[in-house]
Amino acid sequence: MNEAVIDPILETAVNTGDMFCSQTIPNRCLKDTILIEVQPECADTLQCVLDDKVSRHQPLLLRNHKKLELPSEKSVTRGGFYMQQLELLVKSAPPNEYALLLIQCKDTALADEDNFFVANGVIDAGYRGVISALLYYRPGVTVILPGHLTIYLFPVKLRQSRLLPKNVLKHLDPIFKSIQVQPLSNSPSNYEKPVISEFADISTVQQGQPLHRDSAEYHIDVPLTYKHIINPKRQEDAGYDICVPYNLYLKRNEFIKIVLPIIRDWDLQHPSINAYIFGRSSKSRSGIIVCPTAWPAGEHCKFYVYNLTGDDIRIKTGDRLAQVLLIDHNTQIHLKHNVLSNIAFPYAIRGKCGIPGVQWYFTKTLDLIATPSERGTRGFGSTDKETNDVDFLLKH
């Protein structure tokens, strides 16, 4: 059973200035232990507790205990929504083999919960800054009542793959030239650029079946080879970055499906891994929403993208659009492990997810006792140089 622990000896040692002040806790002491530091001001706005609706292996639950008046001065427009970055006033330090998912949690069918949403987030083990959530809500929402905004910090145990990203296409030609692309049938009409890619059957050099038979077909060249589509990662990073292999054009409010020439075959002999695709925080904040989804074994890398920036945009070749997480199959998250999802803001049902058996360790001195981190407090795109990789083609 996972527990919330505050070690009085450790806290005293840190606060009285003996050896723990200049040393971190040995890694062996942090195995399957997630350090949490709750900022003092959190008590003014948020309740931070282990979820008592889960009998064992409890996720961390954050809930507003004061009403949240909207829109605030921090809100910005994102398509047909307002978006606001909410500081949750919590820091974390999981071991490198873990990550935290930030997910909206629902336990009752409250009517107003269909009017505001929390973008799914991935908290890397190396992130030491204050965790934030991205709140999207409809223009008519003026208040979120106490207890109606509930968020899980949900630990997942990661798996490593030596073959990703090196040999994921060992049975296919690694260079792709002719690729079929089509707009979705419900995309805005008269748009000059194709926005959805469906790849040819490379192994037989035959075109794949079009997704919509009434759609026009195009072909484009892909300048990147497969080894540049999925990037390597640092040990403290949760996911492998997924890059777009060509300039991607999205009209405002466009909802598209991306199919990349990567087949998940590296772990067909190792069914202990489930793969999931999530968006990147910098993209979600700008209004480019990658719908979180599973990546089933034996299938191409597919995911949906929703352009809520309010503008027509171009995402440049090589830009990091999404990330793939390899998660231990015993971890039951809010997404089905074998279904392609097109839901922009999926949420968890309270008490229905199964987290790994971790121990939560609450401390007031996380920066002193956590293992060193390369990323530190930099977040929301700090690992990217993305500011010039998205062109806004039409301003409103």
From Swiss-Prot:
Its cofactor is Mg(2+). One of its GO terms (biological process) is dUTP metabolic process. Involved in nucleotide metabolism: produces dUMP, the immediate precursor of thymidine nucleotides and decreases the intracellular concentration of dUTP to avoid uracil incorporation into viral DNA. This is Deoxyuridine 5'-triphosphate nucleotidohydrolase. Keywords: Hydrolase, Magnesium, Metal-binding, Nucleotide metabolism. Transmembrane segments: none annotated. The lineage of its organism: Viruses, Duplodnaviria, Heunggongvirae, Peploviricota, Herviviricetes. It comes from Varicella-zoster virus (strain Oka vaccine) (HHV-3). Belongs to the dUTPase family. HAMAP family: HSV_DUT. Pfam families: dUTPase. One of its GO terms (molecular function) is metal ion binding. Substrate binds at R280, S281, S282, F380, G381. Its EC number is 3.6.1.23. It catalyses: dUTP + H2O = dUMP + diphosphate + H(+).
